[in-house]
């Protein structure tokens, strides 16, 4: 009967490791031939303890975070970036990007990390643009946004504006916000200028011109951009309405004060009893003071605001 393999020391027990890390703890490289070690790729292994005592894996991202951590230990110039960094930070992404299982890394040196499922890009990343999230060295949320402006990201222009808006303060929306990743307009533009010339910089500057603070959801961003695509002016965001005496009224998603038009996106958060009460109060105030409330749904966005635009244009024509 074959003898059971010698136990691995605590740093490698139930972990992903490299040959160098095996050497560091004084264990023979032949140990990887045992049945409890899985080969993940060239020089990369995972230990599967026979007693089931492996620590729980991090599963909040669609790629193997333990493999990522090991690669970052092996390559100190590597950082998690692009779509993978966006996933770590919880930035709003289209469905296909949320589930992208490739591990995106940026390296400073010419030698790429050639492994299945790993996409590497060679570019310099300023230390000021690095953060530690979930134990992984990542590009900061702002740097991640601008890196994603490269055509290779696969994201559309609207997707990028959604991310930029999501990074902005959203304090006017009770119970909504991204917490630790919220920053100000100046922070976003400052990092963009620090990066200088890079692939996608023109698109990044166009995103910066259209990003807005105070946006409550990705759908509100897409509504604003759809209005712009339809040839209408950019509406005010998180607008505070006032009556004829200048007394402040409700705060609304989008507004055209010149034509007294309010545009509200009706998303999931409007289904709570408390929010419905606020919506009724807002609509009554608007009706009393001559403001038209136009509500937009997910179907309207899918249809390109086909049923919304005639209402807005009729209001504008009547006010001319």
Question: Which residues fall in each region the model found?
Answer:
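Surface segments flanking catalytic/ligand-binding clefts of nucleic-acid enzymes
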Residues: 1, 10-16, 21-29, 171-320
């Amino acid at each position: 009967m074959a003898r059971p393999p010698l136990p691995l020391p605590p740093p490698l027990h139930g972990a992903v490791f490299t040959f160098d890390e095996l050497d560091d703890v004084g264990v023979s490289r032949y140990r990887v031939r045992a049945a409890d070690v899985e080969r993940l790729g060239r020089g990369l292994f995972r230990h599967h303890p026979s007693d089931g005592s492996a620590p729980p894996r991090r599963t909040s991202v669609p790629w193997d975070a333990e493999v990522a951590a090991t690669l970052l230990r092996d390559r100190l110039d590597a950082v998690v970036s692009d779509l993978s960094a966006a996933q770590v930070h919880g930035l709003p992404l289209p469905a296909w990007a949320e589930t992208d299982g490739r591990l995106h890394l940026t390296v400073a040196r010419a030698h790429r990390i050639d492994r299945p499922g790993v996409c590497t890009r060679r570019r310099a990343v300023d230390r000021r643009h690095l953060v530690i999230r979930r134990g992984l060295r990542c590009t900061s949320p702002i740097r991640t946004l601008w890196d994603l402006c490269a055509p290779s990201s696969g994201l559309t222009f609207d997707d990028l504006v959604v991310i930029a808006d999501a990074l902005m303060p959203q304090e006017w929306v009770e119970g909504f916000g991204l917490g630790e990743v919220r920053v100000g307009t100046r922070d976003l533009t400052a990092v963009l200028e620090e990066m200088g010339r890079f692939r996608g910089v023109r698109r990044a500057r166009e995103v910066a011109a259209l990003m807005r603070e105070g946006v409550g959801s990705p759908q509100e961003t897409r509504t604003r951009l759809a209005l712009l695509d339809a040839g209408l002016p950019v509406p005010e965001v998180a607008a505070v309405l006032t009556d004829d005496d200048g007394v402040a009224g409700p705060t609304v998603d989008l507004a055209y004060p010149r034509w007294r038009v309010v545009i509200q996106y009706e998303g999931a958060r409007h289904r709570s009893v408390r929010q419905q009460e606020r919506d009724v109060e807002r609509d009554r105030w608007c009706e009393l003071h001559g403001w038209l409330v136009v509500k937009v749904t997910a179907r309207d966005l899918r249809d390109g605001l086909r049923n919304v635009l005639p209402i807005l244009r009729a209001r504008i024509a009547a006010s001319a």
